[in-house]
Amino acid sequence: MTTEVGSVSEVKKDSSQLGTDATKEKPKEVAENQQNQSSDPEEEKGSQPPPAAESQSSLRRQKREKETSESRGISRFIPPWLKKQKSYTLVVAKDGGDKKEPTQAVVEEQVLDKEEPLPEEQRQAKGDAEEMAQKKQEIKVEVKEEKPSVSKEEKPSVSKVEMQPTELVSKEREEKVKETQEDKLEGGAAKRETKEVQTNELKAEKASQKVTKKTKTVQCKVTLLDGTEYSCDLEKHAKGQVLFDKVCEHLNLLEKDYFGLLFQESPEQKNWLDPAKEIKRQLRNLPWLFTFNVKFYPPDPSQLTEDITRYFLCLQLRQDIASGRLPCSFVTHALLGSYTLQAELGDYDPEEHGSIDLSEFQFAPTQTKELEEKVAELHKTHRGLSPAQADSQFLENAKRLSMYGVDLHHAKDSEGVDIKLGVCANGLLIYKDRLRINRFAWPKILKISYKRSNFYIKVRPAELEQFESTIGFKLPNHRAAKRLWKVCVEHHTFYRLVSPEQPPKAKFLTLGSKFRYSGRTQAQTRQASTLIDRPAPHFERTSSKRVSRSLDGAPIGVMDQSLMKDFPGAAGEISAYGPGLVSIAVVQDGDGRREVRSPTKAPHLQLIEGKKNSLRVEGDNIYVRHSNLMLEELDKAQEDILKHQASISELKRNFMESTPEPRPNEWEKRRITPLSLQTQGSSHETLNIVEEKKRAEVGKDERVITEEMNGKEISPGSGPGEIRKVEPVTQKDSTSLSSESSSSSSESEEEDVGEYRPHHRVTEGTIREEQEYEEEVEEEPRPAAKVVEREEAVPEASPVTQAGASVITVETVIQENVGAQKIPGEKSVHEGALKQDMGEEAEEEPQKVNGEVSHVDIDVLPQIICCSEPPVVKTEMVTISDASQRTEISTKEVPIVQTETKTITYESPQIDGGAGGDSGTLLTAQTITSESVSTTTTTHITKTVKGGISETRIEKRIVITGDGDIDHDQALAQAIREAREQHPDMSVTRVVVHKETELAEEGED
């Protein structure tokens, strides 16, 4: 018993140790061990196994505790009689059930087989079993409390002790397996979590990187019209519209459709930023530098709703004028400069403004002290004008300049001759040597296209033509051709259509550009402007000296050669004509100058270059090169012009419509040859006329100054020649290009890279009006051609309109002679009409009569008339009846008036060496006509080469119509003095004052 007890005590110790360990590891094991101890009573019978078995079991337990989770080799130490149970236990464990009773039963049966000879112990075991059975429920519920009861039992059964190690082994295995699995699961989960966290972090990093990439910004710098710079940061892939909107928001500008952003692609090429495309794609590798400019010049700035919009337009025009892109006459420079001072400085104050140095302001490309004095003098007369009113007056005068709103592009015709293509609100203009030689109104253009570096326009056939003609031009490169094409598409859409045209639907494998203007049209813009409802925005006007940064600084004589250098795509195209020449263009109604009322209606054939060139030389081969000409034409007083603005358009139209049949008078008959040529109006005839005139006048480098007083007409010699020249140019119809242009029409458009067929949807039927107007102009030139200098200019007016010649001068003179003496009423009417037409803004060249007329400043009294031969004969005059038919004499009637003439001639004893002999080679010839209320001035400029020496001859004829007597001597002296003042570098060779008095009616001497 002692041995048994000792072994049992050892087993208890081991079991208690195992139980403690198990309890530490997991509380559930303790409950399971206690349940095993309270098993069936049969287990106690086997509580006395052989000592060897007990020692083996204790060893097994010890080894089991020491072993790691890899306890798979433990079966080697288990006796054979336990192996089955082990496997069974494992199965049960695997099943995961807590069924330990079957295992205990197996152990008990085996023990009973071996322990049969101990009946007493069996009885004791049974008793204990009964007691244990009673406590079974309590053991399950109170696991922790059973622990002490089990340890206090006096005779625990050996079977119970032996079974504990086996169950513990299996449980430990199960636990270890579970732990291993859990560890693996936890490890896997941890790994997954780690991976997920890492993945999320990586994704977050990538996302943040992407975000930074998407939000990567580029700094943009935009130079504004007042010279300041606006900077902003834009997303790299932002479209042009984003930047444009930011700039307009910064400027507080709502009427923004007239403006755009320019970027410099090359030193000579500027492009408009397309708002519908990404900026990055358009700039490529260029810096993000832009300039804010006017893209579409409003034909009538007075229709703009807000003052701030007009202010920005003023700033743009000041830049254009100061840089030479918008040529002006001296008087126009002075007048516009005075309005600039009034807008920026306010009313003239002797104390405050007397000491201001006007040289700080830039009014013209080449500013002289004389101009500054004139500006200051005119500034005093604007007292009371608010800045907004001054800006409005500035725009009213500037809009009539011939080059207003013209975008010039370099090109060559089919013969390789350098020309310029100008795009404006009315159509496409063709210039050669700074003279406008043709005009294609939008209604006459059927299709615009480009292929590689060629640009084509398909023109609607004329009345007598059966087929359409295509005219081609060669541009410097493909990009220049595409740029010109896009500008044409945009201008046509903006000015002529009611709404933008939708781009063509993409077709499979189609060629050509799909570009279409996507912004608002002028009609839509005006409609939107009427909806603007906000207080007038406050803005500060800046000094005009900012314009000086774009100046050429070229001398007046050379100015025209490079004035356009900084103009996008038109470098050196236009020169700012000498201070006085520009005004001619102002009168041009059609092309360069837009009528306030119906900008698109005029067929205009005038020169755009026209300030100086306003003169149009007829012949295809004769073009005026005025780089060395320094003639200064003064514009008609602006006040007078403004008074007639309201009725100018009507008068012009009426004047053009009336086409009186010209009849030659006595004096004209003597000069039949030139007249006949003039009548023809063709380019060939023009050439002949020019040659004839050249023979008659060119040889001498002299200046003939004739002053005609009281309706006297001066020698027609120079006049007719001038008229003829102009007329040939007039003849060119807008439908036909100059010879070189038309010849290029043969090129085909089959594979045009870009194609655009303008839809002539005009807002109010302006197209029809324009077409009719053009047709009238075309027809008139022929009959009008017959008109002589002295004849009423009305008939000639129509040809002049196209030719832009000095015809007006003639008409005015004749008409006024008759009207002044015989029909005062008619005189005033006609005079007013002519004055309005010619001086419509002192810059506008009336298409009808004065294509080349420049306004004469009211101040300018130099009535210097160029005449090679002063006529002293009876003059037959034709009265021009206004469309209004106010005159008593019908336009078609040719009244013959008896007149008395008186001529005073002054000839300089020194005549230039080359004056007499060889006439030399005629290089250029120009005729400029300007008119004021009572004075008509015609200037003829010819440039010839004799023996390698270049000669410039200026003949100026001034006709003064009035009822009062004029001192001839004083007029002669004044003419000489003014001629010398205007051209100090030239000598006056001849001055003729011719007075013609109508005896029949007035009886004046």
Swiss-Prot record:
Widely expressed. The modification Phosphotyrosine is found at residue 623. Pfam families: 4_1_CTD (PF05902), FA (PF08736), FERM_C (PF09380), FERM_M (PF00373), FERM_N (PF09379), SAB (PF04382). The modification Phosphoserine is found at residues 7, 39, 58, 87, 170, 208, 386, 402, 499, 550, 562, 575, 598, 614, 627, 647, 715, 718, 828. Residues 22-31, 111-157, 169-196, 690-711, 754-770, 780-793 have a biased composition (Basic and acidic residues). One of its GO terms (cellular component) is cell junction. GO terms for molecular function: actin binding; PH domain binding; spectrin binding; structural molecule activity. There is a cross-link at residues 140, 144 (Glycyl lysine isopeptide (Lys-Gly) (interchain with G-Cter in SUMO2)). Residues 611-676 are annotated as: Spectrin--actin-binding. It is found in: Cytoplasm, Cytoskeleton; Cytoplasm, Cell cortex; Cell membrane. The keyword tRNA processing does not apply. GO terms for biological process: actomyosin structure organization; cell division; cortical actin cytoskeleton organization; positive regulation of protein localization to cell cortex. Residues 734-746 have a biased composition (Low complexity). The modification Phosphothreonine is found at residues 89, 763. The modification N-acetylthreonine is found at residue 2. Keywords: Acetylation, Actin-binding, Cell cycle, Cell division, Cell membrane, Cytoplasm, Cytoskeleton, Isopeptide bond, Membrane, Mitosis, Phosphoprotein, Transport, Ubl conjugation. Residues 502-610 are annotated as: Hydrophilic. Residues 1-80, 93-196, 652-800 are annotated as: Disordered. Required for dynein-dynactin complex and NUMA1 recruitment at the mitotic cell cortex during anaphase. PANTHER family: 4.1 G PROTEIN (PTHR23280), BAND 4.1-LIKE PROTEIN 2 (PTHR23280:SF17). Interacts with FCGR1A. Interacts with TRPC4. Interacts (via CTD domain) with FKBP2. Interacts with NUMA1; this interaction is negatively regulated by CDK1 during metaphase and promotes anaphase-specific localization of NUMA1 in symmetrically dividing cells. This is Band 4.1-like protein 2.
